[in-house]
Amino acid sequence: MLRPDLNKFPDYKPGKSDGDKLKLSSNEIPNPPLPSILEAMTRAAAETNRYQINGCPELTTELSKYLGVPEDHLAIAAGASAIVQQAIGMSCHTGDEVIFPWRSFEAYPLYVRMAGAEPVMTPLTEDDRLGLDAVIEAITDKTRAIILSLIHI
């Protein structure tokens, strides 16, 4: 029932802290949630029998006004990776290429391959900055998207 090509992807293995080394890449913090967060979660739990309102319409309206852009130019999600994955999945086809500097966000190659496209990883400069010349040189007729992360700029 599932696409057989998806079987080649590795299972996610969460990182673990080791002794005095703390793994920060899992986006976990050592402290429990603040009491105000727990109270908000408790209130929200009482509404889990209802469909959520998709798209955060109030936030979208306010951001649209603040930024001076049309509402349909905004995408709201719980994290940037959801938006990146959806954008790649909606725009890429088998045989397309997506360029991004490497080393970068570990999920980029997975998102690209899940869409049926091929990742094209370009090198960073010696000081781990965006190698813009390498990105430009990698552009071909098959290039469908280029992902640039602010961390490298």
Describe the residue ranges of each PLM region.
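N-terminal "arm"/small-domain region of PLP-dependent enzymes with the aminotransferase-like
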Residues: 1-50, 148
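Conserved acidic residues
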Residues: 22, 96, 144
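Hydrophobic residues at beta-strand termini and immediately following loops
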Residues: 24, 51, 77, 122
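Phosphate-binding glycine-rich loop
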Residues: 56-97
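Conserved PLP-anchoring active-site segment centered on the Schiff-base-forming lysine
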Residues: 90-111
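Structural motif
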Residues: 99, 145-149
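PLP-dependent aminotransferase-class I/II
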Residues: 117-144
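Conserved small/polar residues in nucleotide/adenosyl-binding loops
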Residues: 151-153
